[in-house]
C-alpha cells in the first residue's frame, strides 16, 4: 500500500496520467489514491494485446498495430510496449511512424541476448547468453514463462539483494534451470 501511495499519491493534477496493466488489487488501490486527482486518467482497459496466429497486435477502438519485433520476448514487456503505443497515439504520433519504430525498440537489460563481444565470441555456435535485470516476482513469472518456451537446456547465474524478496523470485524458476549458480551481492 505504501509503495502504491508513493508512486501515484503525488502525481500532478491537471495533466494526463496513464496506468499500465495491474492486478485487480493494485488497480483498486491506485484508483483510490487517484480519486481526488483532477487529471485525465487512462487505464489499460482502453487497449489490449491480442495474438493472431503467431503474431501479436496492439488493438483499441480505432487502431490495430502489428507488433513486429524480434527484441521483445515477454508478455510483460509486450504489455509495456502496448502501453507506450497507446500514449504515442494519444500524442498524435502517426500509426506508420509507430509501426516503423517498433522493430527498433529494445528494453536494455530485459530479456536481452548478447549478440557480440568477447563473451559471445567465446561461446559454442549454438549457445546463447541472455541477460535480465528482473527483480520483482511478476518479472520472474514473465521470464520463467519465456524460458519454458525455449526448448534447450537453461543454466542460470543469479544474484539478488535481500530486500528484493529473492525467495519469491527464485521459486518461479522451479524445474526450469538445469543448474543455477548463485553469486553473492556485497
Segments predicted by a language model, with ranges:
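Nucleotide phosphate-binding/pyrophosphate-handling subdomain across enzymes
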Residues: 1-2, 63-179
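Acidic, Mg2+-coordinating active-site environments of NTP-dependent enzymes
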Residues: 1-100
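Short internal beta-strands
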Residues: 16-22, 157-158, 178-186
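Short hydrophobic/aromatic-enriched beta-strand-loop microsegments
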Residues: 38-43, 154-156, 179-182
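Active-site donor-binding loop signature of nucleotide-sugar glycosyltransferases
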Residues: 45, 133, 185
Amino acid at each position: 500500500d505504501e509503495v502504491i501511495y508513493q508512486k501515484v499519491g503525488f502525481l500532478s493534477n491537471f495533466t494526463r496520467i496513464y496506468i499500465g496493466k495491474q492486478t485487480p488489487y493494485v488497480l483498486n488501490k491506485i484508483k483510490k489514491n487517484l480519486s481526488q486527482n483532477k487529471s485525465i486518467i487512462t487505464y489499460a482497459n482502453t487497449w489490449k494485446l491480442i495474438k493472431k496466429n503467431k503474431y501479436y497486435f496492439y488493438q483499441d477502438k480505432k487502431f490495430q498495430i502489428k507488433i513486429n519485433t524480434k527484441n521483445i520476448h515477454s508478455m510483460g514487456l509486450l504489455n509495456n510496449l502496448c502501453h507506450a503505443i497507446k500514449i504515442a497515439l494519444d500524442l498524435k504520433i502517426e500509426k506508420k511512424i509507430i509501426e516503423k519504430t517498433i522493430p527498433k525498440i529494445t528494453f536494455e537489460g530485459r530479456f536481452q541476448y548478447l549478440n557480440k563481444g568477447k563473451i559471445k565470441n567465446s561461446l559454442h555456435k549454438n549457445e546463447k547468453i541472455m541477460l535480465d535485470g528482473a527483480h520483482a516476482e511478476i518479472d520472474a513469472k514473465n521470464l520463467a514463462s519465456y524460458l519454458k518456451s525455449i526448448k534447450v537446456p537453461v543454466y542460470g547465474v543469479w544474484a539478488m539483494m535481500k530486500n528484493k524478496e529473492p525467495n519469491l523470485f527464485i521459486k518461479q524458476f522451479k524445474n526450469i534451470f538445469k543448474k543455477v549458480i548463485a553469486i553473492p551481492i556485497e
